[in-house]
């Protein structure tokens, strides 16, 4: 018995091939800058000065990473950033869900006004000076909490969570209430397990935000041993550039590095850890983004 096959027109085939080629090229264009920095970080001083590094490292060596990890502050920076990212992501995701859930209920009195206030914060922010004065007045200057608390709840993430909660049938909650479940039991036992994809997406957004945060350290932290990783790497790069401007060839000859290879190394060091997390949440990430895009 012959199976019916849907014939594909020539135009559709051409369109499919074009899409594959176009998006492959686009993907390569987007990935190449990062690939180039990785290859440059493994290249020799001579190759980086001549600018001949393109697809593969030239004069392969690990001198750049030896210089980067020779700085003891890099380890305290990793520690601070890891603590901030883990605690901030866990608390931020939970608080975002707990904020969005009641806002998704039509029976909430003043819910529209509250949602308007949430949207208002996306358009008008308090600014740097009021934020600095607030942190100073509540006694959090030079405290690691100053790196965590300001970014706990994002209006954008709250809207994504609210959009997903609206898609959950209310009949599930009604059935749970008939069985005697409280609001907290419904939230933690029914709503959150159904929201894994969205929660993973929000957690990834939040984690990347905390991991890449540089400005908060500059504003609120004075002690070097409490600096986040991004501030440590930026300070390291600045010191390297200044040293090479003053001593020039002597410093480069001693370390077999220059400002460009150090910059490439710091980019890799700061980016790779957060990239390792992505494959574990990838299956949830696409679904979560689509939910936010369609229902938002």
Q: Where do the protein language model's features map onto the residues?
A:
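A hydrophobic, multi-pass inner-membrane permease signature
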Residues: 2-296
